[in-house]
Amino acid sequence: MPNYAIFRFEKHKTVGTIKAASLHMTRGRETQNADPDRKELNEILKGSTDPSADVKSMLNKIQKETGKPLRKNGVQAIELFFGMSPEWSKQATPEKLEHWKTITQQWAEQTFGENNLVSLQLHADETTPHLTGFMVPRDPDTGRLNASRWFDGRKALSALQTGYAASMEPLGLARGVKGSKATHQRVQRHYGNINKTLQLDPKIQAPIPPSIFTNKEEWAEKERLKAQKSALSVIQPLADKAARYVEEKKRADRAEEALSLARRKADSMRAIPLSDVLKTLGMELDPADKKQWRDPEHRFRITIDNYKFYDHSAQKGGGGAIDLLMHTTGQDYKGALSWLADRFGDETARHDMLLNDLYRSKIRINEAKQRPAFKQPEHKNEPKIREFLNSRGISFNNIPDSIRTDDRGNVAFLMYDDKDTLQGAELRGTSSGFKGLALGSSREAHFTGSINVKNDEKYDLYIAESAIDAISVVGFLSPEKIKAGVKLLSTSGVRTSLTKTLRKIVEKASSVHIAYDWDAVGQRAASLLVGAIKAAFPTKKVENWLPPKEQMIHGKDWNDLLMVKRGLKKTVAPKQTVKRKIRF
């Protein structure tokens, strides 16, 4: 039997019912099927400790912005419930449960709106863990409450069930049979069924014994026939119902098998052809090279190989329609997914999203398998390191241990992953312009440096394309800024998404500054990386950090400017505007 993804909802029109549901979420009232000793396992994923207050805050905001009162008898909030088959939760690893939580929250925010989802909590103190919370149905087009946008009609409700189940497919959770005659079950009724216990009918009376004038054998026979008739009237409908249930279960199992087979077939067929995406974007095959796609402005030169693409102009590639759109249009993940849904349909776009995740996972696995073992640079030739750094305008009193030299005399900036394990090195040639990664380096690791940062303190984070640029940034920070605590990070080339390491470091930062090159490629990547960080950390202060325009002409990155500042590189004179005389 397959394991199912469970999604339930309940509409609330009054403050009273919202508060009652909130008390259940926060365990403010007795919950029979909850274990008090496991209450500490519960977790707030979004919102405050008072979900009803989160709803009230959003409703007040809507009234203030629209200048109109809430409609009487209108739906003010939707209570959401996300669960799974008990069998799945019993076998799931902690990592799988974490993925389930993350994907569920992402799906809810993408489906109902990130700001509309005001509260979400994990209940782990019950037999089967589940998520519950509130969404306020604010229409993004009108700014007013409009639950019908998401919950109007059987088709819309079916789409919600299909959408949530699709997001759960990678975890092995499936949708129930589409078109089943089973009816929607309200959240409270779902809890009620969990808590329901068998109750005996107190009205059953024992038969009155016969009088002395009644033949006992005749009386017993009459009572037996009467009891048999009475029992049959109760048992026969139950037997018929049980038979129908068995037949329905067989039919459902057959339907699930057919659905599973159809999904397996669809997995090999339904990826959106990248050529169709490029055509929709207005690109055409180059007449001189039928393998390359070009746009009218000649910004892109793209070749495609099945599910993969490569842009020769930017020297960057990726996999799938979502990556392709993010690269060519500059949209973030959500924007690209919405674009695909508008033009190719919701189901197709959703499937491409799953393939995108699968593709990235396969790439990481293959890279890890094929990557040779990284050999740690053992040398620390300080004279050579100092000579190179001084030539770039950088000086240290003491060379950090994270800067070494390899067997070929290259300067190596050591890269660590999210577990502080050495996983690679960024290399710079001392006698040539060589730069790259050491053999076996992981793209999930980064070179980092810190100034006045303690383990438990916040810091300002500066992210650059190279270790040299990251260190150069310090030359443009005020003493007050440096004293407050600064962390530097290199992405070893442009990056438009978050690695585990980068996510961990960004999470602890009070502000993030993307200090990428100010050429076209660097700024396109900076814009995408800013968007990715804002999507992951909506309240985080993030900016694309650039020098004043008058300084940009002296180079294309922060080390160029540092070398100009240190007198190691000549300044570039600004272009003079020539005033022309107008002749009549």
From Swiss-Prot:
InterPro entries: DUF3991, Mob_Pre, TOPRIM_dom
Species, as recorded: Zymomonas mobilis subsp. mobilis (strain ATCC 10988 / DSM 424 / LMG 404 / NCIMB 8938 / NRRL B-806 / ZM1)
Disulphide linkage map: none
A GO MF label: DNA binding
One Pfam family in the UniProt entry: Toprim_2
Taxonomic superkingdom: Bacteria
Alphabetic keyword roster: Plasmid
Keyword Endoplasmic reticulum in annotation: no
Domain named Toprim: residues: 459-548
Biological process, per Gene Ontology: DNA recombination
Protein name: 65 kDa protein
